[in-house]
Amino acid sequence: MTRQAPDPRITERRNPRTANIDLASAIEIVDLMNAEDRTVADAVATQREEIAHVVSLTEDAFRRDGRLFYVGAGTSGRLGILDASECPPTFGSEPEMVQGIIAGGFPAILRAQEGAEDSPAGGAAVMDEHDVGERDVVVGIAASGTTPFVHGALQRARARGARTAIVACTPLSEKLLAMVDVAIIAVVGPEVVTGSTRLKAGTATKMVLNMITTGAMIRIGKTYGNLMVDLKATNEKLKDRSERIVAEVCGIPRDEARTLLSAAGMRVKTAIVMYKLSVDRAGAEEALAAAGGTIRRVVTDAPPPVPT
């Protein structure tokens, strides 16, 4: 029997540690998957400098009123949409600031759209539709690094002057590397189920995206210490969190924090500055605007210590 050469894409190779997983019990399957997943964080850590570079590019884009776009297909596209959709409630950002684009459009979020990922022209067109330009950052997401839709988007984004990056889980071709300013390549190895990149590759990708958006948002002043001071209180849980943050930072009872938040238009940052500087809402908003929205430049006190 002729022996086939291994697929150059590590994400498509068979995992020798799970070759007989179909004979495993439920607990054995869980243990095998858990053992594989423990390697993911280490793979991501090898890319710390590249991830930090993209954080800095994104910070610069945000400071120039630019945007961050994630572009992917299938699981990769969905992960981009997931990360983008969490930014407004977490950091009080406008929905346009971080956007996730998936090959096949909205229907592809719930159901695979056959052939959509195979069109580089489709990726290029979506960059034109969003008028991507020099103030923007475009991050392609492709576990195997071979998605034509992503390649097309990156090429067009670069031609339009945007900064570009790719998140992948297998070594990339020189041609693809030439399309991007930064390549984040978290090699997690073959999947538990061959080619199922929703597993380790998906986990690694989500970790990287978390770092990009969270890092950039922190850098532009969206937190005070590790407190979420720019959140939008869109539900009861977030209203409760807003009250707890104001009460903790200002050292006041919850009912007083609630009243202060109401006077501040439910903006945590504004409420804290109103209390700390003994000013009204307009005065707090003016002070924050002068400080570029960074609360540390207005309130010189360190955040309260973490309760033990």
PLM feature spans:
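Active-site pocket-shaping loop/turn-to-helix segments
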Residues: 49, 111-112, 201, 233-235
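Glycine-rich phosphate-binding loops that contact phosphosugars or nucleotide phosphates
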Residues: 69-208, 213-220
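Cofactor-/ligand-binding subdomain signature composed of acidic, glycine-rich
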Residues: 1-43, 47
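Short, amphipathic alpha-helical interaction segments embedded in low-complexity terminal/linker regions
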Residues: 216-308
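A generic structural signal for well-ordered alpha-helical segments
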Residues: 61-62, 157
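Gly-rich Lys/Arg/Thr-decorated short loops/hinges at beta-loop-alpha junctions or inter-strand turns
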Residues: 11, 32-40, 100-111, 224, ...
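A short, well-structured juxtamembrane/interface segment
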Residues: 46-61
